[in-house]
């Protein structure tokens, strides 16, 4: 089985389409699709980090997780995924005319997230669980950024 984190990301985040359809929202589908892409990169990144705790088991089970696939280049790929996630989130906000305040908030969250990845997590499996848990804070921060961006188009 190759890249279970990618399969998880594709299926887990499908809920943004379901929520969009259920609410009959005025948000264009193209904006929701941009959000979906950001969520795929987000899930792929945090679940790759979480999978570092299980590398030995994944090898024994012949489960080709993203952490094994990326190998020694894992941190580079994680940085790329996290930066890509935030780029898509900024594109999402731009597609809805959220403005400067939203961009500043998202850039601030992205810098904190990258510091967390590169200075706190540091590619150590024993730090993976706490990094994984901190994604809740990134999520709530992004939610507030979206709420602020949608109400203050400055």
Q: What residues fall within each predicted segment?
A:
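Multi-pass alpha-helical membrane architecture of UbiA-family
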Residues: 1-154
């Amino acid at each position: 089985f190759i890249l279970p984190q990618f399969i998880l990301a594709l299926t887990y985040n499908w809920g943004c389409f379901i929520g969009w359809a259920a609410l009959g929202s005025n948000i264009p589908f193209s904006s929701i699709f941009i959000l979906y892409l950001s969520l795929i990169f987000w899930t792929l990144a945090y679940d790759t980090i979480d999978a570092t705790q299980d590398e030995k088991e994944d090898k024994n089970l012949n489960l080709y997780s993203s952490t094994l696939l990326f190998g020694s280049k894992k941190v580079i790929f994680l940085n790329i995924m996290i930066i890509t996630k935030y780029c898509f989130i900024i594109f999402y906000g731009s597609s809805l005319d959220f403005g400067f305040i939203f961009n500043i908030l998202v850039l601030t969250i992205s810098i904190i997230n990258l510091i967390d990845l590169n200075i706190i997590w540091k590619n150590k499996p024993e730090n993976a669980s706490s990094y994984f848990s901190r994604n809740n804070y990134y999520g709530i921060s992004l939610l507030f950024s979206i709420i602020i961006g949608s109400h203050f188009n400055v």
